[in-house]
Curated annotation (Swiss-Prot):
Gene name, Swiss-Prot/TrEMBL: rpiA
One cellular-component annotation, GO: cytosol
Active-site feature positions: E103 (proton acceptor)
GO BP annotation list: D-ribose metabolic process; pentose-phosphate shunt, non-oxidative branch
Keywords: Isomerase
GO molecular function, one term: ribose-5-phosphate isomerase activity
Protein name per UniProt: Ribose-5-phosphate isomerase A
Native organism: Shewanella loihica (strain ATCC BAA-1088 / PV-4)
EC code(s) of this entry: 5.3.1.6
Length: 219
């Protein structure tokens, strides 16, 4: 089974967590694209979706899935999204696709976070994948200096502007043993919008595509 086939299996397995007549929170990325394809098969049974990125919004609209603005929605029963890394405590690094802030907002509104990944994303310690930090453009150099003090090697992601008009610093060479504390510490730096650690709001259910099929993990 190829990596993409494992992503597809995880994406389709997430349909089980979609409630009839609900509005579904939808994330961003290659695995989520498979979930969107799956969601389109039951679009008549749901009210619609809230999206965490312009890319996912475009794909859902093209497939005829109604997309709502989050400000018009009081509650989401489920949020389905991928991860760049996830550990055994269901803490994640996300934001490889630069949609981390909107992903974090939609995840905060949802009752349940279902994370869909292939088996290459499971790790014991977070940090092998560089940690994305969304930054107000004028604060880029200051924030980079502060991240160095925390032990990281920040690199400006050139040519990338987030959907919110900000820039991304990718922080390399961090072994993250206390994700919750580091998430809060980085978010306290003036000029940081948010960072790609999803630890204070981790996943509730993990669906992992493996060569043997989809593995379900709950904390």
């Amino acid at each position: 089974m190829t990596q993409d086939e494992m992503k597809k299996a995880a994406g389709w397995a997430a349909l089980e967590y979609v409630e009839k007549d609900s509005i579904v929170g939808v994330g961003t990325g290659s695995t989520v694209n498979h979930f969107i394809d799956a969601l389109a098969t039951m679009k008549a049974d749901i009210e619609g979706a809230v999206s965490s990125s312009e890319a996912s919004t475009e794909k859902m609209k093209a497939l005829g899935i109604p997309v709502f603005d989050l400000n018009s929605v009081d509650q989401l029963s489920v949020y389905v999204d991928g991860a760049d890394e996830i550990n055994g405590h269901m803490d994640m690094i996300k934001g490889g696709g630069a949609a981390l802030t909107r992903e974090k907002i939609v995840a905060a509104v949802a009752d349940k976070f279902v994370c869909i990944v292939d088996n290459t994303k499971e790790v014991e310690v977070l940090g092998e994948f560089p940690l994305p930090v969304e930054v107000i453009p004028m604060a880029r150099s200051y924030v980079a200096r502060e991240l160095v003090k925390l032990g990281g090697d920040p690199v400006y992601r050139e040519g990338v502007v987030t959907d919110n008009g900000n820039v991304i610093l990718d922080v390399y060479n961090m072994k993250i043993f206390n994700p919750k504390a580091l998430e809060e510490q980085i978010n306290q730096i003036v000029g940081v919008v948010t960072n790609g650690l999803f630890a204070n709001r981790g996943a509730d259910v993990l669906l992992v595509g493996t060569p043997e099929g989809v593995k379900t993990v709950k904390p």
